[in-house]
Protein backbone atom coordinates (compact mmCIF):
# COMPACT_ATOMS: atom_id res chain seq x y z
CA UNK A 1 0.00 0.00 0.00
CA UNK A 2 1.35 3.43 -0.89
CA UNK A 3 2.03 5.95 1.83
CA UNK A 4 0.29 9.25 2.43
CA UNK A 5 2.92 10.29 4.97
CA UNK A 6 6.40 9.22 6.00
CA UNK A 7 8.61 10.74 8.70
CA UNK A 8 12.12 9.49 9.39
CA UNK A 9 14.51 10.71 12.08
CA UNK A 10 12.75 14.06 12.37
CA UNK A 11 14.08 16.37 15.06
CA UNK A 12 12.74 19.81 15.93
CA UNK A 13 14.25 22.31 18.35
CA UNK A 14 12.31 25.33 19.59
CA UNK A 15 15.22 27.33 20.93
CA UNK A 16 16.23 26.02 24.34
CA UNK A 17 12.62 25.55 25.45
CA UNK A 18 11.38 22.46 23.66
CA UNK A 19 12.47 19.65 21.36
CA UNK A 20 10.68 16.79 19.62
CA UNK A 21 12.13 13.70 17.95
CA UNK A 22 10.18 11.28 15.75
CA UNK A 23 12.28 8.30 14.69
CA UNK A 24 9.64 6.90 12.35
CA UNK A 25 5.99 7.57 11.51
CA UNK A 26 4.12 6.25 8.48
CA UNK A 27 0.50 6.71 7.48
CA UNK A 28 -1.02 4.82 4.56
CA UNK A 29 -3.41 6.35 2.06
CA UNK A 30 -6.93 6.40 3.49
CA UNK A 31 -5.75 5.48 7.00
CA UNK A 32 -7.14 7.37 9.98
CA UNK A 33 -4.96 7.84 13.04
CA UNK A 34 -5.18 9.81 16.27
CA UNK A 35 -2.23 11.53 17.90
CA UNK A 36 -3.04 11.43 21.61
CA UNK A 37 -1.32 13.17 24.48
CA UNK A 38 -1.61 15.84 27.11
CA UNK A 39 -1.40 19.57 26.68
CA UNK A 40 2.08 20.75 25.73
CA UNK A 41 3.26 17.29 24.68
CA UNK A 42 3.98 18.25 21.07
CA UNK A 43 0.85 17.12 19.18
CA UNK A 44 0.33 20.44 17.42
CA UNK A 45 4.05 20.81 16.76
CA UNK A 46 4.01 17.49 14.93
CA UNK A 47 1.12 18.53 12.68
CA UNK A 48 2.70 21.90 11.96
CA UNK A 49 5.95 20.18 10.98
CA UNK A 50 4.10 17.88 8.58
CA UNK A 51 2.25 20.85 7.07
CA UNK A 52 5.47 22.78 6.58
CA UNK A 53 4.29 25.56 8.89
CA UNK A 54 7.31 24.79 11.06
CA UNK A 55 10.65 23.58 9.71
CA UNK A 56 12.32 20.50 11.15
CA UNK A 57 15.88 20.87 12.41
CA UNK A 58 16.77 17.58 10.71
CA UNK A 59 15.21 14.45 9.22
CA UNK A 60 12.84 13.79 6.33
CA UNK A 61 9.11 14.49 5.96
CA UNK A 62 7.46 13.07 2.84
CA UNK A 63 3.84 13.73 1.86
CA UNK A 64 2.40 11.84 -1.12
CA UNK A 65 5.92 11.05 -2.25
CA UNK A 66 7.12 14.66 -2.11
CA UNK A 67 9.67 15.89 0.41
CA UNK A 68 8.49 18.74 2.62
CA UNK A 69 11.82 19.22 4.37
CA UNK A 70 14.66 21.17 2.81
CA UNK A 71 12.52 22.78 0.10
CA UNK A 72 11.79 26.45 -0.48
CA UNK A 73 8.76 28.09 1.13
CA UNK A 74 7.07 28.36 -2.26
CA UNK A 75 7.61 24.64 -2.89
CA UNK A 76 6.25 23.79 0.56
CA UNK A 77 3.23 26.01 -0.13
CA UNK A 78 2.60 24.18 -3.40
CA UNK A 79 2.81 20.74 -1.80
CA UNK A 80 0.56 21.83 1.07
CA UNK A 81 -2.05 23.30 -1.27
CA UNK A 82 -2.15 20.17 -3.41
CA UNK A 83 -1.78 17.35 -0.90
CA UNK A 84 -2.69 18.57 2.61
CA UNK A 85 -6.03 19.67 4.03
CA UNK A 86 -5.99 21.56 7.33
CA UNK A 87 -8.74 21.67 9.97
CA UNK A 88 -7.68 23.50 13.11
CA UNK A 89 -9.47 24.51 16.30
CA UNK A 90 -9.49 28.06 14.97
CA UNK A 91 -10.86 27.80 11.45
CA UNK A 92 -8.94 30.78 10.00
CA UNK A 93 -11.81 31.48 7.63
CA UNK A 94 -12.05 34.95 6.10
CA UNK A 95 -15.14 36.27 7.93
CA UNK A 96 -16.12 38.88 5.36
CA UNK A 97 -15.85 36.38 2.49
CA UNK A 98 -18.69 34.06 1.57
CA UNK A 99 -18.54 30.33 2.23
CA UNK A 100 -18.12 29.74 -1.50
CA UNK A 101 -15.24 32.22 -1.74
CA UNK A 102 -13.44 30.71 1.27
CA UNK A 103 -13.53 27.28 -0.34
CA UNK A 104 -12.65 28.66 -3.78
CA UNK A 105 -9.46 30.15 -2.35
CA UNK A 106 -8.19 26.63 -1.62
CA UNK A 107 -8.76 25.68 -5.25
CA UNK A 108 -6.95 28.80 -6.39
CA UNK A 109 -3.96 28.04 -4.13
CA UNK A 110 -3.76 24.53 -5.58
CA UNK A 111 -3.72 25.90 -9.14
CA UNK A 112 -7.01 24.31 -10.13
CA UNK A 113 -8.71 25.71 -13.28
CA UNK A 114 -10.32 29.04 -12.39
CA UNK A 115 -13.52 28.35 -14.30
CA UNK A 116 -14.24 25.39 -11.99
CA UNK A 117 -13.74 27.13 -8.64
CA UNK A 118 -17.27 28.40 -8.00
CA UNK A 119 -19.10 25.28 -9.13
CA UNK A 120 -16.83 22.87 -7.23
CA UNK A 121 -17.00 24.94 -4.05
CA UNK A 122 -20.77 25.29 -4.26
CA UNK A 123 -21.34 21.60 -4.99
CA UNK A 124 -19.25 20.46 -2.03
CA UNK A 125 -20.77 23.00 0.36
CA UNK A 126 -24.26 21.88 -0.64
CA UNK A 127 -23.24 18.26 -0.06
CA UNK A 128 -22.08 19.19 3.44
CA UNK A 129 -25.37 20.93 4.20
CA UNK A 130 -24.45 24.56 3.48
CA UNK A 131 -27.09 26.13 1.24
CA UNK A 132 -26.29 29.80 1.95
CA UNK A 133 -23.04 29.71 0.04
CA UNK A 134 -23.01 33.45 -0.76
CA UNK A 135 -23.46 34.61 2.85
CA UNK A 136 -20.36 35.92 4.69
CA UNK A 137 -19.13 33.17 7.00
CA UNK A 138 -19.29 35.62 9.91
CA UNK A 139 -23.08 35.33 9.61
CA UNK A 140 -23.08 31.53 9.81
CA UNK A 141 -23.40 29.46 12.97
CA UNK A 142 -20.35 27.84 14.59
CA UNK A 143 -21.45 24.46 13.26
CA UNK A 144 -21.87 25.83 9.74
CA UNK A 145 -18.45 27.47 9.91
CA UNK A 146 -17.00 24.08 10.86
CA UNK A 147 -18.57 22.61 7.72
CA UNK A 148 -17.08 25.38 5.59
CA UNK A 149 -13.66 24.66 7.12
CA UNK A 150 -14.02 20.96 6.34
CA UNK A 151 -15.09 21.76 2.77
CA UNK A 152 -12.04 23.97 2.34
CA UNK A 153 -9.82 21.16 3.65
CA UNK A 154 -11.08 18.47 1.26
CA UNK A 155 -12.15 20.36 -1.88
CA UNK A 156 -8.81 19.68 -3.61
CA UNK A 157 -9.04 15.97 -2.76
CA UNK A 158 -5.91 16.04 -0.60
CA UNK A 159 -3.80 13.02 0.19
CA UNK A 160 -4.01 13.72 3.92
CA UNK A 161 -6.07 15.90 6.25
CA UNK A 162 -4.42 17.22 9.42
CA UNK A 163 -6.89 18.06 12.18
CA UNK A 164 -5.54 19.85 15.26
CA UNK A 165 -7.96 19.72 18.23
CA UNK A 166 -10.88 20.26 15.81
CA UNK A 167 -13.54 19.82 18.51
CA UNK A 168 -11.88 21.59 21.45
CA UNK A 169 -14.30 24.54 21.45
CA UNK A 170 -17.46 22.44 21.00
CA UNK A 171 -19.83 20.77 23.44
CA UNK A 172 -20.12 16.99 23.46
CA UNK A 173 -22.99 16.76 20.96
CA UNK A 174 -21.49 19.21 18.47
CA UNK A 175 -18.04 17.66 18.90
CA UNK A 176 -19.40 14.24 17.98
CA UNK A 177 -21.19 15.66 14.95
CA UNK A 178 -18.07 17.54 13.85
CA UNK A 179 -15.92 14.40 13.99
CA UNK A 180 -18.59 12.42 12.12
CA UNK A 181 -18.43 15.09 9.42
CA UNK A 182 -14.62 15.18 9.23
CA UNK A 183 -14.21 11.41 9.10
CA UNK A 184 -16.99 10.88 6.56
CA UNK A 185 -15.63 13.67 4.37
CA UNK A 186 -12.16 12.10 4.46
CA UNK A 187 -13.58 8.68 3.55
CA UNK A 188 -15.46 10.09 0.59
CA UNK A 189 -12.42 12.06 -0.56
CA UNK A 190 -10.13 9.05 -0.10
CA UNK A 191 -7.92 11.10 2.21
CA UNK A 192 -5.88 9.87 5.15
CA UNK A 193 -6.63 11.63 8.44
CA UNK A 194 -4.17 12.49 11.20
CA UNK A 195 -5.99 14.08 14.12
CA UNK A 196 -4.41 15.49 17.28
CA UNK A 197 -6.50 15.56 20.45
CA UNK A 198 -6.07 15.39 24.22
CA UNK A 199 -9.60 13.93 24.53
CA UNK A 200 -9.30 10.23 25.40
CA UNK A 201 -12.92 9.66 24.37
CA UNK A 202 -11.80 10.30 20.80
CA UNK A 203 -9.70 7.14 20.72
CA UNK A 204 -12.60 4.80 20.00
CA UNK A 205 -13.18 6.58 16.68
CA UNK A 206 -9.80 5.65 15.22
CA UNK A 207 -8.32 2.42 13.94
CA UNK A 208 -4.90 3.56 15.12
CA UNK A 209 -3.92 5.61 18.16
CA UNK A 210 -0.40 7.00 18.42
CA UNK A 211 0.70 8.23 21.83
CA UNK A 212 2.83 11.32 21.43
CA UNK A 213 4.71 10.10 24.50
CA UNK A 214 6.15 7.36 22.28
CA UNK A 215 8.19 10.10 20.66
CA UNK A 216 11.00 11.85 22.52
CA UNK A 217 10.03 15.31 23.66
CA UNK A 218 11.51 17.65 26.23
CA UNK A 219 10.28 20.95 27.58
CA UNK A 220 11.51 23.20 30.33
CA UNK A 221 9.01 24.14 33.00
CA UNK A 222 7.67 27.66 32.75
CA UNK A 223 8.51 28.11 29.07
CA UNK A 224 6.14 28.38 26.18
CA UNK A 225 6.53 27.54 22.53
CA UNK A 226 4.29 28.32 19.58
CA UNK A 227 2.55 25.14 18.46
CA UNK A 228 3.41 22.73 21.23
CA UNK A 229 -0.06 21.61 22.30
State each model region's role:
Residues 68-85:
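ABC ATPase NBD coupling module
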Residues 157:
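Conserved catalytic motifs of ABC-family nucleotide-binding domains
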Residues 124-138:
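Conserved ABC nucleotide-binding domain
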Residues 161-164:
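Catalytic Walker B motif of ABC-type/P-loop ATPase nucleotide-binding domains
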Residues 136-146:
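Conserved ABC ATPase signature
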Residues 97-105:
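Short coil-to-helix segment of the ABC ATPase nucleotide-binding domain corresponding to the Q-loop/switch region
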Residues 51:
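Helix-to-loop junction immediately C-terminal to a conserved catalytic motif
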Amino acid sequence: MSHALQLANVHFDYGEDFSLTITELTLNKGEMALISGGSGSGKSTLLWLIAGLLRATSGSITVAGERMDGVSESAADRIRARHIGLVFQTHHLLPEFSAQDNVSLALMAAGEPENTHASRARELLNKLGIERVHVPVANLSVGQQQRVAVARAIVCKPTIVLADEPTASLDQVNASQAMDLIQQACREAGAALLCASHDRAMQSRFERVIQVDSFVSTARAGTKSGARA
